[in-house]
Amino acid sequence: MKKIKYYIFFLLGAAMIASCDNELTEDVKMGIRVEQDGVSMQGDVVTVKAGTPVVFNFSGDPDNIMFYSGEPGAVYAHRQRTEVAPEDIESATLHFKIGTQYGKVYENTLEMFVSDQFEGLTKNDFKKDSVLVEQFAWNELVAKSELPDKPSIQKEYTVDVTKYLGKPMTLAIHYQAIDDTKNSMPRYNFSEMYIENVRKDGIVSKFMPSQYGFTAVNMMCNHNLKSQAGMKTNREYGTMTNNTAGIWNLVNAQNGGFYIAGGGKNTGNKNGWLVSDGLITTYCDPDQGTVIKNITQNVESYTHTYNKVGEYKATFIATRVNYKHDSRMMKELTIKVVE
């Protein structure tokens, strides 16, 4: 009798394990219904007046749900897009600030250029690149007379670069300081630099300096300056993470900041360029979805309001993920927003 009981318990345990295994390997299921006054749903088409909240009711057992409303900036098909057509952009503007420190002689120390004709640096032929940047017919990005002309000041700049949309725009900054043996040399701090694209659909994207492909061209790399002795490798094109005189520091470029310092007196002349890749100024941020459920939540509905008349494709991505199975499904609804 005891053996029979053990056998029954064994069968029950095996059945429970099998049931759990089946549950872990089931595909995700999700249904969506809209049932409310003032909103109609026919098949996969929802019709609603602008400004009326839509309540999406869920059935099934998804662990996670991601929602793309279909409005500008939240289109599922654009979730990996990083460029738009030039005609889709209303304006493109380069913003930045320049602050100064130290030094006394600022005349002709800093130059800023732009071009859509620059062929690009080789980045492995320093002789060719150093001649190219010096002899190229650059266009002034900011006139010399408008750049900071003394220490301890900050100026803000806004430059319209809309005309470069769809063209490979290269930015170049040239620092050249002469050691007069009496004064330290200027330091220029660039901050809050970004290219702002305003699209015709109202979405704004920011393109930061860390995305520009900036490369330094260190014109004094073969002069064995004591102030640059700490730069042991890539002296031709390298940047530094400290205050090495005459060498660009791009550590904070992802936040819009970088700088170059000339160093103290009697440390030798400084000469360095900072040149971007050919920038595709039609950059945009990928569209983003909204997480409306994760595995820790029990969500039965979600409310979203469409305020502008038009037709949108709302996309819901449902997933179930565990150590045995990974299941995903997509549900799309056409949202017709009327007056």
Regions found by a protein language model. Name each.
Residues 130-164:
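Extracellular carbohydrate recognition and processing domains
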Residues 178-181, 319-325:
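Short, solvent-exposed loop/turn segments at the edges of extracellular beta-sandwich modules
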Residues 300-308:
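Residue-level recognition of secondary-structure-to-loop junctions
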